[in-house]
Every structure is written in C-alpha cells, then in structure tokens.
Amino acid sequence: MNDFYHVLIKNDGSIIHDVFATSHKDLICKYITPADDSKSYFRAMYSPKMDCRLDDLDNYQIIISENYIPDWFQGSLAEDITVKLREVIESMIVRGHKQLLLHDGAILVGTAVVQELKQSIVFAMYDHARIKSLDKNSEIHHVTDECIIEEMHDSTKIEELSGFAKVNTMFDYSKIIKMWGQSKVNIMNDNSRIAMLKGDANIISMHDEAQADRMKHMSKVDEMHGHSVIEEMWDWTIVEKMFDQSRINYMDEESKVCEMFGDSMIEVMCGNAIVEKLCENSLVRKLHDAAQILQKELE
C-alpha cells in the first residue's frame, strides 16, 4: 500500500502521526506550529516491503520522503524511533473480539471480530477477520482472503475486495471501488454502488437503485431487480437474469445476458454481445456489429 503510513519524525525522538491523515501535508497543517524549525523534523513513510502484509512487523522499513537524511537521525535516536514506530503499528492490530471501533484505525487479522465500526478506518483485513456492521462513513482500504463484512451502511466505503472476501448486504450509499479475484457481494440495496468488477467477482442480486459501473473479465451478476443499473459490460461478463425495470446501458465484446423479464432494458449492444432470451416487456434498444438476441418470447 503506497499510502501507508505517513509520519513526521522529530529531532527530540517523538513521532507525529494520525490514522486519518492522507498526506504529510495533513500532519504538518495539524501538528506543526510556526515555532517549529523545518529542520527539526522530517517526513517519512513507515511501510511494509513490497508484497508484505500490514501485520508483518518484521518487514517494515522507514522510507524518508526528503532529499536528504538529517544528521541527527542516527545511533540510539534512530533505533528508539524504529522501536516506537513498530509499537504504533502493533497497537493497530486486532486479533480478537472488539465490540466497537470509534474514531480509530485498525488492521484486522486471524479470527478477529468487530461488531461495529463507526467513523473509523481499517487499513487491511486478512485471514478470517469479520466485521458485523460498517457504519457512519467508515472505510476499509483492503479486504482479502476469506474475510467477511456482514453489512455496509450510510456512505461507508471499501476500496478493494479480493481473494474470497465477501460482503453480505450493502445499504444506503455504501460503495466498493474495486472487486476482483473471487470476491462476492450477496445483496445490493438502496443506492449502493460498485465501481469496478474484475476477475471472477460476483454480485448475487441487485435491488432498488443499486448500480455497478463497469464489469470486466469473467465477473458476473446473478439477478437484477427494481431500478438497478449496470453501466458497462465487457469481455466475458454475464448477467443471469434481469427483472422489473432494471437496466444495462452498454454491452460489448463477448458479454452476455441470459434472460430478461418484466420491463428490463438494454440500451446498446455491440461486438459479439448476446441476449439468450427476451421475455415479457423487456427491450433491447440498439444492436450493432454481431450483437444478437437468440430467442424472443414477448407479450
């Protein structure tokens, strides 16, 4: 993770950091006063080495974000700061049960269980970690392995869902930026949104005004209901069934819809896109290239 973890290291051995800081500028604006000499501190990242997990404390390194290394950062002072930085990350790691994380930053590992997350950040979830309720604008940067989030509410966000990770239900304006691997979302409700599905990512059912912006590779949606929308389908993506007034705006390449019912609609089909069966009042507005509808059973 390129943005983990911003710190300012001071010449008195203290470390300035904040789990909600997204840049060194944030830390400087909040914690550095006009009385502080610019040479009394330096900007750095405390990050794991490439491809290492965030809980792998033995593989962290200090990456100095300056054009120079201060003369005072050496010897026992440098050693003490390294120990303190390790303790900062260690304090974030949750391995057991937590009833609530509030205004907090965490890394969930093993069989960790958090009942409720409010206005907090989870930098990563690994192994079999679980969150029951993600709420109040909380966010998770990376979810992988066989981790589970039971419910997403409010305007909560997951940046990346991968591996065999799963979200059971999305509500309100909750959002996932990218799904890949064999990750899964069971139910999307309200105005929930997924920006990108790749790999073998799967949505079981979409309802209400739920939306998926772009489907790639072999990702799949089992069922679309209500006024749910998919903006684009590419590659070998599949939608099994469309109902009600669900809509797909654009299909291309080898993408496929198996069955359409109710007043469901596809705006444009291009490439070799296919609808296997068009039923009831369902509609495809425009066909281009070799796109085709294989069977019609309209009312």
Residue spans for each PLM region:
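Short, glycine-biased loop/turn motifs at secondary-structure junctions and
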Residues: 1-299
